[in-house]
Amino acid sequence: NHPIEKRPRILVTGCPIGGNAMKVVKSIEENGGNVVCFENCSGAKSVDELINEDTPDIYQAIADRYLNIGCSCMTPDENRFKLLGRLLEEYKIDAVVEVILQACHTYNVESYYIKRFVTGKGLPYMCVETDYSSSDIGQLNTRCAAFIEML
């Protein structure tokens, strides 16, 4: 076991994580990583900005807020890259792991651009495609252990 302060700081991005998909986070942490930030549908992007309450049309402000969430379903998706870049610096990230759920095609397509963005900042990147089953836990552990070992 590694002391927490010496573990690589990992940002998890991509699809929502919950239920059995938490196996990715568990695998990262059991293999020596420290997940310090989630930039995914259930993470920072959903709470990053407040709704502008000082407006005559609060419904428009709510709609604007939801339409500006950095999501792979939105094109162009500049807001996701802005948030990701800010989080990489703010949390002093050592590496990024992107979680893609099988059949989530929008995140799968955008992973190419996320990889370019992250590696362009000089950080290691790994993409994990998984599902909600437990059938790939062995493969996840092998990949996460190798990825973290190279950091």
Label every model-predicted segment.
Residues E5, E30, G120-G122:
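Short, well-ordered coil/turn elements that cap or connect secondary structure elements
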Residues N1-R7, I17-G18:
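Electropositive, gly/pro-rich neighborhoods at or near active sites that engage anionic ligands
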Residues H2-E5, A63-R65, K92-A95:
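A short alpha-helix capping/helix-coil boundary motif
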Residues F81-L151:
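TerminUS-proximal long segments
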Residues L11-T13, V99:
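Short hydrophobic segments within beta-strands
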Residues P8-R9, V25:
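Small-residue-enriched flexible segments
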Residues P16-P76, R80-L83, L87:
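Redox- and metal-dependent alpha/beta enzyme cores, enriched for Fe-S-associated oxidoreductases
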